Amino acid sequence: MAWGLAGLALAAAAPTVTAQLPPALGAVEVRSSAGVVVANTREAAEAGAMLLRAGGNAVDAAAAAALALGVSEPEASGLGGSVWMLIHLARGVDIFVDGSAAVPAAADPDVLEALRTAGVNVGYASVAVPGGLAAIAHAVEHYGTRPFAEVVAPAVALAENGIILPPHGLAVLENFRSRLLGSPTLTGIFLDESLVLRPADPLLCQPALARTLRVLARLGAAEFYRGEIAATMAADITANGGFVHTADLEAMRALERAPLHGRYRGFDIVASPPPGAGAAVIEALHILGRFPPERLAAADPGSRTLTLEAVRIALADLLLAVAHPPLQALLVDKGHAARRATLIRGDRALRADEIVPRPGAAAMRGSTHLSVVDAAGNAVSLSQSINHEFGAGVATPELGFPYNSSLSLFDGRDPSGPFYPRPGNLLSPTMAPMIVLRHGRPMLVIGSPGSSRIVSVVTQVIVNVVDRGMSLADAVAAPRTVWAVDGSPHAAIEVAGVGADETVAALERFGYPSVYTLCFPPRPIDLMYFGGANCAGVDPRTGDIVGVGDPRRAGWAASGDPR
């Protein structure tokens, strides 16, 4: 069933369906009248759905799911990281809650630069002040309906009773085993006495994390920033060469900032503001909006290259705007997008010097995304990160969660630069939580992990829904073509089925060198390269609330319907 431009006059909704990502993966579509929660693990999605069934709203459910991800997807999120929360309230109010990690007051630019030069991006010296829990607690207090203790309870139970990691989680553990071995605490959590992956056991229990979460449920998030937990964190971090002190934790506050707004083919786009990457998605869509929908109607080489060129331009403008904040307003200006659209050629890729990219926003790998829509029409698009897989690769034994490695993203060379580690400076992420509204209702709630590829992933799923009229399941499962700027800039494509070789050849002829090609069936660790766009939304035809988990990272959609 189509949702986009073609979806205004379509047949009635199909029952629950599975769209295939050939030849082995499927994106399962869940429909509900009571709300949906979509996250990278079943446990997290069910934790959020539990809050919906208890009478909570989308904010409560998103908070519960985010905390549960810290237990069930510890390589990508947790109490030691950052959270970015885009909220749409049914009464028509949009809010962005920024829980970015911050530079501690004692951070030494010379030390950080020496580590960066040496290629060291983990360890206690890379730990910034965690802001994620502050954002979650702020959102629950101001926009939720359930007590904070109730929101934390599912995560406590998961840590206490244990989880079974999915295949992609096991693949990440195996791939980053050496990072775990660098920390006795993380080794003890995830590896057994023979240094073999502990998830081979029936359940992975995390008793230290369970104790920490239980304290937070009883005393609230203030304990994390101003109580015994804060003191324990600061003592361990500073004793091991890090810079986070109790004063830094005490000063941490979540920030509310105005979201950005754009418009694409008659749909309203709500996005996270700079320094995040939501503005780049809006600009890419505004650029694509200068071309007729027919140019994007089919997933042929021409539509793929058009989308990639729009994303390349938008990423370059984002990086420039992050370095020069007065330019940020241009990113959502349709006149600017119209001018930039004239650069795009139909016969070849733009050269880098034609786009004029600049160094800029941080590319984050250890990240995740969840989406929620409740029965009242409230929606949350939430992204979170600990920066690298397992963050800094260190954890305090008594607390049981890995710290972020966000200080490794700052640049200590230029004191006047936007990425200089000044005290209090916030991380500039590539995360892009988004909400697409139709007549004020959340038609699509979306975001993704995936470092610099996030803008491509999110833009492409929106195009799939709006321009190609795909259902959410088909839009998420459709093979992707993305642009990556981590390392040498390059295109990457998922290929499957008839014509795959011709598609790759067409991209190379267009001027994209060294196209990274992922053929099916892939390894789970390779499939993750193309993001994890867990989506939710209201079907404009039936009014059903729909959730679709991205199969690339074992995404799961859970319903708020009574059990």
Describe the function of each predicted region.
Residues 256, 364-367, 429-431:
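Short, small/polar residue-rich loop motifs at catalytic or cofactor-binding pockets
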Residues 17-46, 50, 56-219, 224-226, ...:
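Noncatalytic scaffold domains of N-terminal-nucleophile
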Residues 11-14:
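N-terminal signal peptide c-region/cleavage motif recognized by signal peptidases
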Residues 71-95, 243-245, 378-444, 468, ...:
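Active-site rim segments in enzyme catalytic domains, especially the processed small/beta chain
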